[in-house]
Structure formats: C-alpha cells, structure tokens
Amino acid sequence: MFLKEKIYFYSLTIVGNISVTPYGKTRIMGIINVSPESFYKDSIKRQEDEIQDTIIRMQNDGVDIVDVGGMSTAPYLKTLVPKDLESKRLHNAISAIRQISNIPISVDTVRSDVIRSLLKLEVDAINDVTGLKYDKKMPDLAFEQDLPVILGAYLSNRENLYGDGDIQDTSSLLAESIRIANKSKIDDDKLIIDPSIGFFRKEGFNPFYSKTLGMDWYVRDIDIIANIKLLTSLKKPICVSISRKSFIGSLFGLDVEDRLIPSIIAEIYGVMNGVSLLRTHNVKETRQAIEMLEMIH
C-alpha cells in the first residue's frame, strides 16, 4: 500500500461497507450517468442490461463505490431536468444495480426530494456538488437518514463574487459547508470534501456552479490540483473528480475521448497529496495506476 503522510482528522468515513480515510487505501468511485445530457457519452448507461454490465465490469476492475447521476450539473451545458424525471432515471438505474450487486451507491444530486424518493433502494451516500447550500432541506435529510455526504465547494451567493476560486477560497467554501452540516447535527465522520473541479466559472447555464472573477476555470482547476494538500487542514477525507474534465481539453486541445492520460496523472498526483477518493470514468486504468504507485513507493 502507498503510505501517505499521516493526516490527523476526526474519523474515517464509512460509505456502505467501504472506509474512506486519508491514510488508508485509496478508494475508487466509478461514474454511471443515466442522463443523456452528460458530457462524456461513454459514461451514459440507460438500459438495464447496460447498467448491469457496467457494474460487473467496474467490480472486476476494482471499483469500491459507484456514483449514479440522473442530471448533468456541468456549468457549460443546458442540462436542467425536472426533479421527477431525475428521480425516475435514478430509480430505474439503482433498481437495476440492486438486482445484481450490493456495492455502495452514492447518488449525485442536489435535490433532497430526489434522495427521499430513492431511500427504499438502499442508497449509501449523497454527492451534493453544492455542499448542502442549494437545497435547504438536504442537511436535515442527510442527518435523518444517517447518510454520508460528499460536500462540493460552492459559492451560493452570486452577489458576493470570489476573486479566483483559488485554494484559499475553496477551503473557505468547504468550511462553510462543514458548518452547515454540523448545524444540522451531521457527524464529522459522515463528511467528505470535494474541491469541485470544473465548477468555478465566469458564466454558466445552471445554478450549480460558482461564479468567479479573475483566472479562467482551467487555470483555477490546475491551481487546485497543485495545492490539493492544503485541503487536508479541514481534517476530512478528500474526493476529487478530475476524469476527462474540460480543463484538460482546454489545456491540451483534446476531445473528451482523448483525455485519459492527463486524467490519470492528475489523479495520482492527488493521491500523493492527500486525496482519499477518486471519482472516475476510468476504473481499470485508475486502479492500475494506484497499484503501480504502491509498488514504486
């Protein structure tokens, strides 16, 4: 195992039966999108057999958790859908998964009503890109259901623009989300933080991005990855979602299908600097890269 520098924090976080900790095994979260609007078309699985085949493949490739999304929140796309449609998509997908697997499932949504509609399907975590700030009912629901939450860095007040969304800004926004969670009595060991790569923009088409001034988003994203270790001061496990993101395309002029190698390099840099959970489209390649790092180090 790659021995990370020991980071003192409150407690490990359990998602289903999987522990997520800064100084333990790096965990892999595989992405399944059931929203046809999502930016990476190879991640879109809508039919039951497609979803089940993907789960089997991911498990064979070494996935720990799957993150299922029913609505794209990419800032640069017009992808908002009604919550009933999002719920229906997710219900069908998670039902298909539960027919064949007990793998821990995280639900990628900002809507508490969507989570509530899925509770009978045994979901294991909430992945909220707005860090409990968009839907005011989400914190209480997470507490009520004792669900771990991945808190995305998010600036909810569009009138109070941050200069760049740099690592200091990002840390402050995540600290705000931690305080919101604590106010709703969500235990610290239920929280994972995510710096929201790709979500800090000057302009966007939905309410789920953070509006900033100053540096362009792709410069900001590289700055966050370069300084990711500073987020360990928040004493929470860190999740990053770098896989095939648009900053890689902007930096290298690459289409989404050609962004694998830069994605893997950035992910491994994150692991070497305190990241505990990698949310990725590329489970097999990410697992191989982590194992190689463990052999070398």
What is the meaning of each model-derived region?
Residues 13, 65, 89, 109:
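Active-site loop-to-helix "anion-binding N-cap" substructures in soluble metabolic enzymes
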Residues 114, 194-195:
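The catalytic core of metal-dependent phosphodiesterases that act on cyclic dinucleotides
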